[in-house]
Regions:
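Positively charged, small/polar-rich N-terminal and surface patches that mediate targeting and assembly
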Residues: 1-118
Length: 118
């Protein structure tokens, strides 16, 4: 099998993006998600500036952006968890399915498996 055909076997994963008001809130949410195995990895992009209309006014805020990498099987649960534990009244939660390399996708799937109760 050639290297090209080995690399073309992709695994579907789900990426979930959200923003938080500060590093304390971002770190807490990221740690909870990893601890509960709802995502295999959380990437913190750092501060971004968001402009949006809220209650009839244009607002601007500096926020921390997080990108969660999870499996198809855990994506809905992750979205519900973020929504329930987010400090904003209407949090930005955007998700999309993506193809990952086979090894990375398998790692995400393995790391987001529910632990077996023994």
């Amino acid at each position: 099998m050639s290297i090209v055909s080995e690399l073309s076997v992709n695994t579907p994963v789900v990426l979930v993006l959200t923003t938080l008001p500060d590093s304390e809130a971002a770190s807490a949410l990221a740690q909870q998600v990893i601890d509960t195995r709802l995502a295999a990895c959380v990437t913190e992009f750092g501060m971004v500036k968001s402009r949006y209309r809220w209650n009839g006014k244009v607002e601007a805020a500096e926020e921390l952006q997080l990108l969660f990498k999870t499996s198809l099987a855990r994506s809905d649960e992750l979205t519900r968890f973020i929504e329930a534990n987010h400090p904003y009244e209407t949090p930005e939660i955007v998700s999309w399915q993506a193809d990952a390399s086979a090894a990375y996708g398998q790692w995400i799937t393995a790391e987001t498996q529910r632990p077996l109760n023994v």
